[in-house]
Amino acid sequence: MAPILYMTLLSPPSRAVLITAQALGIELELKNVDLAKGEHRRPEYLQLNPLHTVPTLIDGETIITDSHAINAYLVRKYSSDDKLYPRDHSKRALVDQRLHFDTGILFNSFRNAAAPLFYRKSKEVPQETANQVVEAYRFLEAFLEKNKWTAGGEVTIADFSLAASVTSLDVLVPVDSLLFPKVTAWIQRFQELSYAKVNEPGLNDLKEVVKKCMA
């Protein structure tokens, strides 16, 4: 029986899990959670995930409610090697650091940038918030100074989460290729990965939503 993923395509963390599953060749049973209708706050969903967030993974008796934890779990359980989430302590620590950077900085920046448009009927991202996003891009540029990927020379689940967040942020606060050439090149490398295409439908949906909000 395929693992069940409760998700929504607009969500960067949900798309990060889809990217990981695609990279691993895992078939998931997808269940869309309509946040606009409050489906994430229904009692049956809260029993699975009291935090009422997406994504949530159910694999047999196992329930996991954070995208980074889900991706690490999928690699450990289903991958034939450890390339996407290395067992080496130093390499794994670097991947973990990048994942925490996504949680604390990048995805948090996305939420802060999107909230005024989605929930407060604003037609633009506040300048202070946009400045914080640019600062996040600056951190990422530094991570890529000596490496092809965000946690070293090989692609990892850190890239999947960060790419899902950055490509979404780029819709709200575009990445300046002159200021951030390494981030720009990294996005291009990511998009050339065959399994990265699973990020595109949700990203296109996000572009349409943002376009309507800014109109």
Residue ranges and their predicted role:
Residues 1-128:
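GST-like domain detector, emphasizing the conserved glutathione-binding G-site
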Residues 1-3, 211-215:
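Eukaryotic N-terminal low-complexity, Ser/Thr- and Lys/Arg-rich leader segments
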Residues 8, 34, 157, 202-206:
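Short, solvent-exposed turn/loop segments enriched in Gly/Ser/Thr/Pro and often Arg
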Residues 65, 90, 178-182, 198:
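Alpha-helix N-cap and coil->helix boundary residues
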Residues 75, 165-166, 200:
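Active-site-flanking alpha-helical
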Residues 82-87, 108-110, 150-153, 196-202:
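Short, hydrophobic secondary-structure boundary micro-motifs
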Residues 98-192:
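GST-like fold's C-terminal all-alpha helical module
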Residues 192-210:
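Charged/polar, low-hydrophobicity segments characteristic of intrinsically disordered regions
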